[in-house]
From Swiss-Prot:
GO terms for cellular component: cytoplasm; cytosol; nucleus. It comes from Schizosaccharomyces pombe (strain 972 / ATCC 24843). Has a role in meiosis. This is Uncharacterized kinase mug58. Keywords: ATP-binding, Cytoplasm, Kinase, Meiosis, Nucleotide-binding, Nucleus, Transferase. It is an enzyme of class 2 (transferase).
């Protein structure tokens, strides 16, 4: 079996043991760093659950980025915060929109829900929300599984004093104020993450594996469409996220490890699962 097949098999068996809510879909969260295989895993689970006659709706945290105009305004209003000059971190998503969509599924609404998608190719790679005519439509009442994936799904804000102390002992001490801003915004995501019934965490055995994984992704993309970021740009891109991993992953992993409704999958450098529990 491939690494993906092993992981999918483990998750399907895990899901069989989880209590299912009545009158609404089961909401499965998938969290993992860039390049860990979240989207590929979500698609594979979608396929396998559909084969079992489940009705599946799949979407990503990325689908709920602010519109291009909103992101430009956010960056303009926070010129001294390098962490929000581009999409990615907490504060750059439409949390109200996302919360409303998940609320519809949690309530088992019989009204059709529209789920956006984000077109990262727009505005020269700066990105914008895709045309509404291409949004996904779903009926929460007839949906049995929602798969919601994202790199920071499940992250919890730290005490601001604790974050300041930790930031000052790292190479990110010069952006302490920016880190605190993002940390405050992370609180807005908690009502969203609390709607998840079970969380699967894809965890890198060594967080620096993310650089290699993201480079592999970009090389594959460039081979397919003949455009993309240089290696230097990819490294800078990952650098943007690295303080978030360093400050928040420990808390998430501890929470997942102790929760019987969560599944921790630790990956080696080749994305092979070395621990699944």
């Amino acid at each position: 079996m491939s690494s993906l097949e092993i992981i999918v098999d483990k998750i399907l068996k895990f899901l069989e043991k989880q209590p299912k809510p009545e009158g609404r879909p089961f909401i499965l969260g998938i969290s993992g760093p860039q390049g860990s295989g979240k989207s590929t895993l979500a698609s594979a689970l979608d396929t396998e659950l559909t084969r079992k006659n489940e009705s599946v709706v799949k979407f990503s945290l990325d689908d709920f980025y602010l519109t291009h105009a909103e992101q430009v305004e956010l960056a303009k209003n926070n010129p001294n915060n390098p962490l929000v000059q581009h999409r990615g971190l907490a504060g750059t998503h439409d949390v109200t929109f996302l919360n409303n969509v998940l609320n519809a599924f949690v309530k088992g609404s019989d009204e059709e829900v529209s789920i956006p998608f984000y077109d990262k190719s727009k505005f020269g790679g700066y990105g914008d929300r895709g045309d509404e005519s291409q949004w996904k439509k779903a009926n929460p009442k007839t949906t049995t599984y929602v798969i919601f994936e994202g790199w920071m799904v499940g992250f919890e804000p730290l005490d601001s004093c604790m974050l300041s102390v930790r930031a000052r002992s790292t190479r990110w001490q010069n952006i302490e104020g920016s880190l605190l801003w993002v940390n405050r915004k992370l609180a807005d995501y908690q009502p969203i993450f609390q709607k998840i019934d079970s969380l699967v965490e894809l965890e890198a055995q060594e967080i620096n594996y993310v650089y290699r994984w993201r480079l592999q992704q970009e090389h594959a993309l460039k081979a397919r469409i003949h455009k993309g970021m240089s290696d230097e740009e990819v490294i800078e891109f990952v650098n943007h996220y690295m303080p978030q991993y360093v400050f928040y992953l420990g808390t998430l992993s501890n929470k997942v490890h102790l929760n019987p409704h969560c599944l921790e999958i630790i990956l080696d450098e080749n994305r092979y699962p070395v621990v699944m529990h």
